[in-house]
């Protein structure tokens, strides 16, 4: 039984779990949800807040902001594209946090189940790369000596153009 709060992350129906939330990401529950009888592989990627960024030591926390109305449709486009490229996907979850996150906290989850590991790894890699390139979520970094918007921001692309 999944333990996440339905008011925060609604019950999942179907085989795609797409969400933007200010609350803690359900790492263990998303893994359990992805396990399917016909799938021998589940790949779970959890992006966590690290203590440094390019040219910046001593990162203390990140604050994520998003264009809320556009996030889930973009996540849906990524899931759709992944299913076109890897039709054997059993389940796919794309979940991202907003708000202030301290070092070590999970900010993004990509979970993919497939019958075999190669496809699960490939699809998960595609999904996180497409999410980073096409979903309007931005991070503000706070470190010992100051703060600024993240240096790794890229222009927003369509999921289908990510290779």
Predicted regions and their residues:
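N-terminal, polar/charged subdomain of small-to-medium soluble alpha/beta proteins
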Residues: 1-107, 113-115, 121-125, 129-163
């Amino acid at each position: 039984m999944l333990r996440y709060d339905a008011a925060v992350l609604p019950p999942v129906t179907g085989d795609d779990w797409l969400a933007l939330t200010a609350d803690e990401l359900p790492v263990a529950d998303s893994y359990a949800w992805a396990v399917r009888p016909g799938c021998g592989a589940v790949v779970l990627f959890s992006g966590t807040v690290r203590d440094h960024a390019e040219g910046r030591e001593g990162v203390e926390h990140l604050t994520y902001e998003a264009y809320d109305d556009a996030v889930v449709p973009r996540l849906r486009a990524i899931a759709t594209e992944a299913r076109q490229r890897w039709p054997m996907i059993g389940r796919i979850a794309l979940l991202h946090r907003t708000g202030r996150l301290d070092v070590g906290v999970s900010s993004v989850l990509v979970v993919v189940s497939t019958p075999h590991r190669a496809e699960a790894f490939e699809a998960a890699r595609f999904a996180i790369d497409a999410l980073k390139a096409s979903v309007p979520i931005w991070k503000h970094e706070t470190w010992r000596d100051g703060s600024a918007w993240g240096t790794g921001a890229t222009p927003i692309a369509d999921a289908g153009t990510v290779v």
